[in-house]
Design a protein with these regions (language model features):
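Transmembrane helix boundary and interhelical junction motifs in multipass membrane proteins
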Residues: 166-172, 256-258, 270-272, 340-343, ...
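Long extracytoplasmic/lumenal interhelical loops at the membrane interface
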Residues: 248-286, 313
Length: 415
């Protein structure tokens, strides 16, 4: 155990949860990939998709390890550089991005043959930047006008480029920004004012899109159709949602067994948006509940690590990059059970795709970097306490020796 602790720093419970997620993802991904083999017809077998997923997980764990060894104080200057890089990637995706799995918006770019979704990277960087700004002004008084350029301008630029091709990610990103602002003691009146302004700007954007539909093809129609489909009682329109519910019901308490899902062949997005339904069908309510419990444990560890962090930046950074992982997981599960409209949000570790896994691992590496510093501080505190105890014991021994010598001298005088 000591050998592992020498290399794996930070919260050991979070490390355990991460490894559980990684191991539990293999069988569902292997099972659900049979539908990908049929739909994509690329010549890759289910075993090939499993090997690919194992490789992505292995690379993700390496990302966690490398980042968690990096002192998190260096993330503050890197956040500004990362923000510029994310804007370049987002702009390139808007201009020359590709569509994957039927999406009608350019969300992906290819780097060395690997598909990459810049919005996932942009979310982590933006929340890191917001945490850095709030840490800088934490003890100072400032007006809303003074925070427009350093805070809101980067937020608006990032959200604008993310929301156009991906409304659900943009909405989640804005919600996470507001959460970090609230925890970082940004004045509530400024938060409310900016939220009202955001609603007005979004309404104006919708009017512009309606007035010039050729400039923004299909986007408003897609958002509208998803909401209407969710509200509709027509089972034909709710094809995927209905099949997902059927998969969950057929799973029962114990499930059909690993690889025995029937609905995976009827769900076009069974390996991504609705993979939780496949998990419940094969492993039952018991397996689905275990997955939910893992997300809850992960959330608890994020809160504990944040409370133990020794700096304001560390506290905000953990919650800023950590909570979106849990939030994204619950949104994906909510879509599968029919509580939410289809959003396109991934189930961390389970959804096929390198971007989802690697960006999740990047965020977890940042959290563990903060945790490693806290653990190191605690270890130093314990060592200092032990040293003080040893010094006190030594002083007591020396005092006892002096008392003994005095007693001996008294005895010698009497003799």
């Amino acid at each position: 155990m000591e050998r592992f602790r020498r290399y794996l720093k930070g919260d050991i419970s979070l490390w355990g949860v991460i490894l559980f997620f990684a191991l539990l993802s293999f069988l569902p991904v292997y099972s659900s990939s049979s539908n990908l083999v049929y739909l994509e017809r690329t010549g890759i077998s289910t075993r090939g998709y499993l090997i690919r997923h194992v490789g992505l997980i292995a690379a993700g764990l390496l990302i966690i390890y490398l980042i968690h060894r990096f002192p998190y104080r260096y993330f503050r200057p890197l956040a500004r550089l990362g923000l510029l890089l994310s804007w370049i990637l987002l702009f390139f995706a808007l201009l020359k991005g590709s569509t994957i799995e039927g999406a009608n918006a350019s969300r992906w770019i290819y780097i060395m043959g690997i598909s990459f979704q810049p919005s996932a990277f942009a979310m982590i960087i933006l929340l890191m930047y917001v945490a850095s700004y709030l840490a800088e002004v934490y003890e100072t008084k400032y007006s809303f006008a003074e925070s427009i350029l350093p805070l809101w301008l980067p937020v608006v630029i990032t959200l604008a480029m993310v929301t156009l091709p991906n409304l659900s990610t943009g909405a989640m990103m804005y919600a996470m920004v507001l959460m970090v602002l609230y925890i970082g003691r940004y004045p509530i009146k400024y938060i409310l004012g900016s939220s009202i302004l955001a609603v007005l700007l979004f309404a104006l954007f919708m009017l512009v899109v309606k007035a010039f539909p050729d400039a923004f093809p299909h986007r408003v129609d897609t958002w509208k159709n998803r909401i209407e489909t969710f509200m509709s009682k027509d089972k034909e329109e709710n094809y995927q949602s209905e099949r997902a519910k059927m998969a969950i019901v057929s799973g029962g308490f114990w499930g059909q067994g690993a690889g025995k899902s029937v609905m995976k062949n009827l769900l076009p997005q069974g390996s991504s948006d609705f993979i939780f339904a496949i998990v419940v069908e094969e492993y039952g309510l018991l397996g689905g509940s275990a997955l939910i419990l893992l997300f809850i444990i992960m959330l608890v560890r994020f809160v504990v690590i944040s409370m133990k962090a020794t700096t304001i930046f560390g506290k905000l950074l953990v919650l800023g990059v950590g909570i979106p992982i849990v939030f994204q997981g619950f949104v994906n599960m909510g879509v599968s059970v029919g509580l939410l409209p289809v959003t396109g949000q991934n189930l961390p570790f389970f959804t096929t795709g390198g971007t989802s896994i690697w960006m999740t691992c990047m965020a977890l590496g940042i959290v563990l970097s903060v945790s490693a510093k806290s653990v190191k501080s605690e270890e130093r505190k314990v060592k200092n306490e032990q040293r003080s105890e040893v010094s006190e014991q030594r002083s007591e021994v020396s005092e006892q020796r002096s008392v003994n010598s005095e007693q001996r001298s008294d005895i010698d005088e009497r003799i």
